[in-house]
Amino acid sequence: NTHEIQALALTEACVDDAEAGKQLLNDTHGEIEQISGDGSYDKRKFYEATSRRGVKHITIPPRRNAKIWQHGNSKKQPLPRDQNLRRIRQIGRKQWKVESGYHQRSLVETAVFRFKVIFGNTLNTRTLPRQITEARIKVIALNRMTQLGMPDSYRVI
């Protein structure tokens, strides 16, 4: 809830979100209480990475045509994805998003929006290693601005 960016990943276009997400997990220090992401993270490799990292609560909506990975009669611990899928089947996707805290993900979208408003939508350097350095410097600056104080926001009726 600090509104700070904890990790960043710049990748080539051929890298999927779940693969980039694994890198973000590795680059994040300390305990991770909750991961929220859109359906593009609904892949085994990402769930396995969150399990290895010890993430307590995983809020990723399974794809609409998703199937259970590990059935309920298994002696193994239930998979978080399967628990999410079962709950969605019980109460519906919309209610699941409210119940699970899925909308916390909008804080990430807001941070990315702030980044783009302040620094623009493009990077100035040409090579990927330099772009990563440029993005890291900008993230440090944005986090410092965030630490100095977020604007007061309120609803206008």
Predicted regions and their residues:
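General secondary-structure edge motif
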Residues: 1, 5, 30, 87, ...
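Intrinsic disorder/low-complexity detector
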Residues: 18-19, 44, 67, 75, ...
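Basic, amphipathic alpha-helical segments enriched in Lys/Arg and hydrophobic/aromatic residues
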Residues: 90-157
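Detector for Asparagine
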Residues: 1, 26, 65, 73, ...
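Short, intrinsically disordered/low-complexity patches at protein termini
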Residues: 29-30, 71, 81-83, 136-138, ...
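Polybasic low-complexity intrinsically disordered regions
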Residues: 1-56, 62-63, 116, 137-139, ...
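Helix-centered, glycine/charged polyanion-binding patches within enzymatic domains
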Residues: 41-113
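Short loop/turn and capping residues at structural boundaries
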Residues: 36, 61-62, 127, 151
